[in-house]
Structures are given as structure tokens and as C-alpha cells.
Amino acid sequence: MSTPGVPARPGKIIAVHVAYESRAAQRGKRPAQPSYFLKAGSSVAATGETIERPAGTSLLAFEGEIAVVIGATARRVTEAEAWSHVAGVTASNDFGLYDMKAADKGSNVRSKSRDGFTPLGPELIPAAEAGPDSLRIRTWVNGEVAQDDGTSARQLISACRGSSPISVSI
């Protein structure tokens, strides 16, 4: 992992279920309250590394994500204070094996936490240069835009309110 400013092995990766309107529209629903799941630090990879689909699986899917990298301990902080604990933001891809998703019953351990399934980077944008309410993500597949959406970093940060430095929320 060699993205400047992004931890090689974050202590925690907290992922938000259905963080973007485009994903909610694809699924036809949005949860009333945000829910989260954890990914292993070993799932982190650098941009451009090869992702391997395990034998016996066929539904390897992407989810473009905005990764918020926590730079200072964030315990019992208000939503208004949360951005001051952010080191920066970068792009991420939350790969998943959808053939295993139903069997995992929401834990996502086998389907989304495999080695290399969370590429980060290529660069960390310092928090001072990125506003928490104006983050956008665009994902291309074979040169075609497959995702173009935005979200509030406040939603992503709320997952990290008990986090220490080198945590990542996607």
C-alpha cells in the first residue's frame, strides 16, 4: 500500500451500508437509520493492484466510495466538531462477492473483507482542502461512468465517533 497520507493498514475500516442515493435507488430502498459493517485492515490495497475473484464465485462487484481518513481521536464529538478530526479524503472501491452476500447475512466478512478488496487512493486530499458537505464520487467501468453521486462526509464521520487515528470510513 503506497498512497501518501493513507495508513497502510488502518486500525479500523468502517463501511456505511447504502451511503449514496444512487445505490439506494438501485436497491429500491434506503434504511431509516444508517447501519455499518467492519472490514479487515488486510482488505486495503493500493490503487491499480490486481483484485482476484476466488474460484467458485462469479459475482465480483464494485462500489465506488469516498474514504474519510481519521487523523485524530474522535470520541464523544458532536457532528459539528467531527470534521476537525479528519486527516483527509481519498477514493476507495468497496469490492464484494455478491454470491456470498446472502450467506453472510449482513456481516460481509467473506463477501467484502478479503485481502485487497478495499483499494484506497491514489492521493489523500487534506481535510482543509475538501469541504465535508460537498464530496462527490464518480466511478468508471471500461471508460463509461457507472456511478456519479455525492454525500455528506458527516454521515461517513458519524460512524467514526469512537475512532482513533488511522481509522477509515467508507
Regions found by a protein language model. Give the residues of each.
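Short loop segments at secondary-structure junctions
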Residues: 42, 71-75, 95, 127-129, ...
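Residues embedded in well-ordered beta-strands
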Residues: 65-69, 90, 138
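Extended, compositionally biased flexible segments
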Residues: 1-63
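Phosphate-binding/catalytic loop of phosphoryl-transfer enzymes
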Residues: 58, 65-75
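Short helix/loop capping segments that flank catalytic or ligand/cofactor-binding pockets
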Residues: 24, 47, 77-79, 99-101
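Catalytic-pocket segment enriched in acidic/His residues
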Residues: 1-6, 23, 29, 98-170
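N-terminal accessory regions of nucleic-acid-interacting proteins
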Residues: 75-90
